[in-house]
């Protein structure tokens, strides 16, 4: 279901992701890169989309192999970056030999993978002993609720189910001439961390980053995201 959605949204997503300072990535990705270890031999990005995370990792010295389930997104990623390898494949069945990477990165992609648990297990398979998995997801609390308004002090209301099995979410947004439909799977914390535990990972670090004060000074509605976490990030190591 998720793969078909992103195939349809590929062009819209490329326009959205590539407009500088347009979406949350520009505010939150520095927190994520602070979690990522220094480059070693090979880094795998799973769910690379149009490739912006891989390009940013390359600028930080990583040698990247990136995969995505969408043909269109892989084509866009290749067009923007001839220095790395981009492959279309299922994250739940990676075409790599065991213990062939030092680092696996999932930036806002675990919730887009139909079989999240198998994707985590596959990441463990292709990582060397002591290899690291770094991930960012929409925070499970943010997925379960909404702010009542755009005001900085707006109440946050949980109006969906947090506990239990995964649930499908979708949101349509039009802003500054760009249109995007976001959709994927929402999990509770136990869903993500249970998958890591069963795959043999130990969590080293967890972050719930907040926007900084200069961001709030430019847009007072961002104060909402200093009270409720928008994203959850972690670093885990393969035993």
Name these PLM-found stretches.
Residues 1-39, 52-56, 73-76, 80, 132-171:
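Conserved class I S-adenosyl-L-methionine
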Residues 44-46, 50-93:
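Class I SAM-dependent methyltransferase SAM/SAH-binding core
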Residues 92-103:
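A short acidic, Gly/Pro-enriched loop at the edge of an enzyme's catalytic core
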Residues 103-116:
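A short SAM/SAH-binding and catalytic strip from SAM-dependent methyltransferases
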Residues 117-132:
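A short glycine-rich, Lys/Arg-flanked "PGG" loop and its adjoining helix->strand segment in the class I
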Residues 141-145, 176-190:
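Acceptor-substrate binding/catalytic loop of class I
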Residues 183-206:
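Short alpha-helix
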């Amino acid at each position: 279901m998720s793969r078909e959605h992103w195939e349809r949204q590929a062009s819209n997503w490329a326009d959205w992701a590539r407009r500088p300072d347009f979406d949350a990535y520009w505010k939150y990705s520095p927190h994520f890169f602070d979690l990522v270890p220094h480059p070693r031999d090979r880094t795998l990005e799973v769910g690379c989309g149009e490739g912006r995370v891989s390009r940013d990792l390359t600028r930080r010295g990583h040698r990247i192999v990136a995969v995505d389930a969408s043909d269109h997104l892989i084509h866009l990623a290749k067009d923007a970056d001839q220095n790395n390898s981009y492959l279309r494949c299922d994250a739940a069945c990676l075409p790599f030999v065991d213990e062939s990477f030092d680092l696996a990165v999932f930036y806002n992609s675990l919730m887009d993978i139909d079989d999240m648990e198998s994707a985590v297990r596959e990441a463990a398979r292709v990582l060397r002993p002591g290899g690291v998995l770094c991930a960012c997801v929409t925070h499970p609390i943010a997925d379960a609720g909404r702010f009542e308004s755009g005001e900085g002090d707006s109440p946050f209301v949980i109006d969906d189910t947090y506990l239990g099995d995964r649930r499908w979410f979708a949101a349509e947004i039009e802003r500054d001439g760009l249109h995007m439909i976001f959709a994927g799977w929402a999990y509770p914390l136990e869903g993500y961390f249970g998958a890591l535990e069963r795959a043999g990972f130990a969590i080293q670090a967890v972050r719930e980053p907040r926007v900084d004060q200069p961001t709030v000074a430019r847009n007072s509605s961002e104060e909402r995201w200093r009270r409720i976490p928008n994203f959850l990030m972690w670093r885990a190591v393969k035993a």
